[in-house]
């Protein structure tokens, strides 16, 4: 048996050689293995922590989205409530019931106005009545659109809505593969964006506010804006401003409690201060208290806001809904 530092080497397990326990002698790679194990453990802890943090952030995001969604639904519901209040036949534009707050903190603010105060485009172009078309031309002039553009816009609109008879209006572009009018009346105000010559006008914010397709037709003197009134024959800025001041009352706002009570077309005639000849020019072009109304109701819940817009016809006790829009 070979010697171990001058002593005999024992092969039995657990025996010592030169005072050293062979079973407890460290392996050359033991420190490397221990270090790797620690690194793996730390890496596992890091990954687990990252997963927990990601999960927590996801839950927080979902809760936040859920809260925002709940507030949006609440705002939409309360906006609908305001619109439904406006449908009641006893509610007038200046009614205090058009604004309110619920127990849950949500609130609504609704505004009721006459649809007839806007220009009904289909009515203006129907049959190419020169007096009606002149209202549209003057309105575009009030909006500071030059003569050449006005001619293009009006002729293109006429081509767009009239039946396809092969005739073509002088200032409208010819039909092509890229431009093909449907030759039917407008169904949505937004169609104007597709009509030649109207792109610049319809890119202006609020351009659609003074147009409609849903009124009875003639301009409603109870609700027409300054620009719409100026488009009527014989109405000068002085006449219009004087009329609006009287119609709106001290606060200068339509649809409030201090508005002048105008009972009919004869009262409107007196407020306009037109002679009989001047007023006769408006015959067939104006009305008073068109039965078609518009309500715009804004619901608020926290920072969330939703708007409901309805156009309806108020005849009798049951309103007839024409359009509904949410945004």
Give the ranges of each region predicted by the language model:
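Compositionally biased linear targeting/interaction segments
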Residues: 24-29, 33-327
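N-terminal leader/signal peptides at the extreme start of proteins
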Residues: 1-34
